[in-house]
């Protein structure tokens, strides 16, 4: 516990909040180029083959980004839009690829939550 005199001399330093997506540099989204597209397995107790991509962002930073939805058309040198948002069962994956923008196609035959997966409204 500081004395009044110590507080007068130094004051209290404000707590600095650490960002959860540092590679985006305070932007909501960032453009990048896929350097590698592959699958990984989640940590226990889950079991699957999660689709992820290694992306070199516009600032030159390389991040691992998750590809959401069923099926994708991404390959090496695809230009993608990356947003923040971690995948809980994949350690080190703190970013997601935005579906339906740039080279990424939206999810086919998607009826619900379409805006999250870049799916257009189905024609009647």
UniProtKB/Swiss-Prot annotation:
Annotated signal sequence range: none
Gene Ontology annotations of biological process type: translation
InterPro entries named in the record: NA-bd_OB-fold (IPR012340), Ribosomal_uS12 (IPR006032), Ribosomal_uS12_bac (IPR005679)
GO cellular component: small ribosomal subunit
GO molecular function, one term: tRNA binding
Modified residues annotated as 3-methylthioaspartic acid in this record: 89
Span list, region Disordered: 105-124
Pfam families cross-referenced by the UniProt entry: Ribosom_S12_S23
Keywords, in A-Z order: Methylation, Ribonucleoprotein, Ribosomal protein, RNA-binding, rRNA-binding, tRNA-binding
Quaternary data: Part of the 30S ribosomal subunit. Contacts proteins S8 and S17. May interact with IF1 in the 30S initiation complex.
Function field: With S4 and S5 plays an important role in translational accuracy.
Protein family according to the UniProt entry: Belongs to the universal ribosomal protein uS12 family.
Identification of the protein by name: Small ribosomal subunit protein uS12
């Amino acid at each position: 516990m500081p004395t009044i005199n110590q507080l007068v001399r130094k004051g209290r330093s404000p707590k600095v909040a650490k960002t959860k997506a540092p590679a985006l540099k305070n932007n909501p989204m960032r453009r990048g180029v896929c350097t590698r597209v592959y699958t990984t397995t989640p940590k226990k107790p889950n079991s699957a083959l999660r689709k992820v991509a290694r992306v070199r962002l516009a600032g030159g930073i390389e991040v691992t980004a998750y590809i959401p939805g069923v099926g994708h058309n991404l390959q090496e040198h695809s230009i993608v839009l990356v947003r923040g948002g971690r995948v809980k069962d994949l350690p080190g994956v703190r970013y997601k690829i935005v579906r339906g923008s740039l080279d990424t196609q939206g999810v086919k035959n998607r009826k619900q939550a379409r805006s999250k997966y870049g799916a257009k409204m189905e024609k009647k």
